[in-house]
Amino acid sequence: GATYVIQDCRELYDMKSAAGIPGRIGCLMEKIFTRHSDVVIAANAFRAKLMVKMFGLKKRPFNYENIRRLAYSSEERARQVEQECQEFFAEEKFRIISTAGCDMTRTTGKMIEAMKDLGEKYELLLIGDSEEEDEELAHRIIQYYGLTNVKILPRMDQDHLKYFIDHSQVGMVTYHQRDLNNKYCASGKIFEFLFEGKPVVTSTNPPLKEFCEKYGVGIADDDYAQAIKAVAEHYTKWQDAVHYFVNHVHVERNNHRLAQKIQNVLEEKQA
């Protein structure tokens, strides 16, 4: 039977941001490959539009949001995690959680600096793998401002991460905007927080800004301290908006819709 090529473009780099000759060759290969694929999938509508221009595509790629919902591996594991971690949350604080670790390209330095304006009622949890120099820099910023409201934690398994998000108040989703891949970042990270009932504060990258404005589930603002305060002040209102949104998102339907579109294209090609 016929063979079809379906390309899922998770990353998006152009010649300008490609690293050296190997990177440029990679970009060129991707351009050729993408133009000859039967179906192309982009991470969001912004990228789909951009790819038409970049790769000279006849059709706009399908866009597919990677919607991820955290779940406990078992009820017993959930109880274990609760026993291990409940002490960590004994003190009542307004907790902000980021799963970018100390990654400075994800504007973590700015996030830490924002904590000096928020004071002791707030706490920032940085969770995830970090480059050694990024972690050192994070510690230096914390030391410089004499902060006691920032905690750096290692990467966690899904059970622990779910518990930590569940017991925090706001999720941070931030990226730099110096290359296309980051500027037009996929907003999948947002869903991890929303499914736990938490509003988000994000950087102003176009997909994140549009998402926050369209669904009212958080604030996209480059002044992180101001945005966090704004969410904290009307926290119940933001939570209600998140619950409304989550009740109207259907992961399986989202997946099925894309599968149906792909099937239609391939059937047309067979005809």
Region locations from a protein language model:
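Conserved donor-binding/catalytic core segment of Leloir-type glycosyltransferases
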Residues: 41, 81-106, 111-115, 125
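A charged, aromatic-enriched C-terminal amphipathic alpha-helix characteristic of glycosyltransferases
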Residues: 79, 83, 222-228, 233-270
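Nucleotide-sugar-dependent
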Residues: 105-106, 157-164, 171-191, 201-210
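Nucleotide-activated donor-binding/catalytic signature segment of Leloir-type glycosyltransferases, i.e.
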Residues: 128, 135-163
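A short alpha->beta transition loop at the rim of the catalytic pocket in nucleotide-sugar-dependent
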Residues: 169, 195-198
